[in-house]
Every structure is written in C-alpha cells, then in structure tokens.
C-alpha cells in the first residue's frame, strides 16, 4: 500500500492560516500525477510550527479531500510519548491510512527509551506505524537492532523512513527482519541506490514538483528495471541537490510557488525566505528542467 513514490507534502498557508483550498488543489495534483501516497504534517509540511489544532485540522482535511483515492499518512510523532499517542489516536479516528512517527527529538532518549516510546504508541493504537529515523534533526539515531525489535514485537509497526544518508542501513535492516519489510528512503538523492538493495520507495521532497517523474522512477525500480530508472535519477540529480541548498522545506516551497502550485510563499518563523543568490540557483535548475520560464 505504501510502496513507491510518497510525497512529503508542503503545507500551504495564506494570510497566516492554513490554505484549505490550496491543500485541496495539491492533493488533486498528486492524485492526477500518479503519486502513490501522501504524508501530511511531516518535516516538509512544517509540522513544528503548526498549532495542535492546525495539526489535527490538516490531517482531517487531507483525509476528507483524498476521499480514499490516495492513502494519507499522518505525521503524528512527537518527543512527548503522551502527545504522540493522543495525535495518533486522532489520526486513526478520522481515517488516516497510516502514521509517520519520528524518533523523539531534542530529549535524546537511549535505544531502550526509543523502544519504550514506540512500544507505548503501538500498544495504544491500531493504525499502521511507519517509524522515521532522521538523526541530523533529532539528535539521536535509532539503530537497526532497535527497529527490528519493534518490527518483530508489534504487527502495526510496518516500516521505517530511513534518512541517515547511509545506504547500508537498508541491508542491515533487512538482515535483521525480512525481505518484505517496508523501508522508504528519506533522501531523494539516495532513493535509487536504496531501492537497488531492497528499499520499497521514497518519502520524497522533490515529488512536490515532479510527481510523475519520481513515481515512474520508483515504478521502474520496483520492477527491477534499474537501467531505465537510473536515467531519471541522473536526469534530476541537480534538482535533488538544489532542493536542499537551504533548510528543507524552504527551497521546495519556493519552487512550488514559482511554479504556481501554491498561491502564497508563506513560511513560518523561524523558517525564512531564501537568500537571493540561492533563489537564483534554484531558478536556474528549474528553468533547465522547463519547470518555470
């Protein structure tokens, strides 16, 4: 259900509030362009600056707008176990198809603390849980052994978004679990290398603006057609890189605005607009790929 190309959706704002119609348009855009699933309220969706009410509203609106035409994965992780459980229960209640659970950030739990955190969430909910390992943001790395333990102990822990930048993690995780475990790349630049050794797809930033291409690359990789998939990977390599020229989601939201996919380039502080020099670099790559004029 969650194989292939999953978009880490940007959150459109307008006049300081959630742009409901903008969100609806983005969801339709991804349905029309072959995206396999949508993550809302993740890192790319600016979840840290959403109010609790906005977080719930975003999930509920996405579920309603999708109307079961595309799976919705709700970002409901937190560094408070109680808060993560509460938000995950809400996502389950309103009909989200899965939950993305980030490793607790800032408070830097031990591996046993990470296990106990996700154990509590898994025991309190029934929704499929995709764990999210991104040590560059959280300050702690969930080791493959910890994930494997959770995967083996709780049937609703179905997979992991692996954003360590380490392709070997795929093989390590498979060796501790099985070939069918859901591993999703958390880095567009590493999607194809990770799929070559057993990952099942990507939770993608670039998919916000090139959904057809990312979807096709993942489809080819899942079919074992790596030579064809490699052509797409290499063609968009410069785009994958420039989208991280500043902190995500600043460049991708700027690109979406320049392409007319969102009406307002609103970022919430402490995120701030791109520097002029970096924006020009972004525009240059977008023009090269005929995404803007």
From Swiss-Prot:
Q: Which UniProt keywords apply?
A: Amino-acid biosynthesis, Cytoplasm, Diaminopimelate biosynthesis, Lyase, Lysine biosynthesis, Schiff base
Catalytic activity annotation: L-aspartate 4-semialdehyde + pyruvate = (2S,4S)-4-hydroxy-2,3,4,5-tetrahydrodipicolinate + H2O + H(+)
Q: What is its EC number?
A: 4.3.3.7
Q: Can you quote a single GO CC term?
A: cytosol
What's a GO biological-process term for it? Answer: lysine biosynthetic process via diaminopimelate
Record site: Part of a proton relay during catalysis: 43, 106
Q: In which pathway does it act?
A: Amino-acid biosynthesis; L-lysine biosynthesis via DAP pathway; (S)-tetrahydrodipicolinate from L-aspartate: step 3/4
Family assignment? Belongs to the DapA family.
Record's subunit section:
Homotetramer; dimer of dimers.
Q: What does this protein do?
A: Catalyzes the condensation of (S)-aspartate-beta-semialdehyde [(S)-ASA] and pyruvate to 4-hydroxy-tetrahydrodipicolinate (HTPA).
Name listed for the protein in its UniProt record: 4-hydroxy-tetrahydrodipicolinate synthase
Tell me the gene name.
dapA
């Amino acid at each position: 259900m969650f194989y292939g190309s999953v978009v880490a959706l940007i959150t459109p704002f307008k006049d300081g509030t959630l742009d409901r119609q903008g969100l609806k348009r983005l969801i339709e855009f991804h349905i029309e362009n072959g995206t396999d699933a949508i993550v809302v309220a993740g890192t790319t969706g600016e979840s840290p600056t959403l109010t609790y009410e906005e977080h719930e509203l975003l999930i509920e609106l996405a579920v309603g707008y999708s109307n079961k035409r595309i799976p919705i994965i709700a970002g409901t992780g937190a560094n408070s176990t109680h808060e993560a459980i509460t938000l995950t229960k809400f996502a389950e209640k309103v009909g989200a198809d899965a939950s993305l659970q980030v490793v607790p950030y800032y408070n830097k739990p031990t591996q046993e603390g990470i296990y106990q955190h996700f154990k509590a969430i898994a025991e309190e909910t029934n929704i499929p849980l995709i764990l999210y390992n991104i040590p560059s943001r959280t300050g702690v790395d969930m080791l493959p052994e910890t994930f494997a333990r959770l995967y083996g102990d709780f049937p609703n822990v179905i997979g992991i978004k692996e954003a360590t930048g380490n392709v070997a993690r795929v093989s390590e995780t498979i060796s501790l679990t099985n070939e069918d475990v859901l591993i999703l790349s958390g880095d567009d630049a590493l999607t194809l290398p990770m799929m070559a050794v057993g990952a099942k797809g990507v939770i993608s930033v670039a998919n916000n603006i090139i959904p057809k291409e990312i979807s096709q690359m993942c489809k080819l990789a899942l079919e074992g057609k790596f030579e064809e998939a490699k052509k797409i990977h290499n063609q968009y390599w410069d785009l994958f890189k420039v989208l991280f020229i500043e902190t995500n989601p600043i460049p991708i939201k700027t690109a979406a605005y320049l392409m007319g996919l969102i009406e307002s380039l609103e970022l919430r502080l402490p995120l701030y607009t791109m520097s002029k020099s970096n924006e020009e670099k972004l525009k240059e790559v977008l023009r090269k790929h005929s995404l803007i004029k």
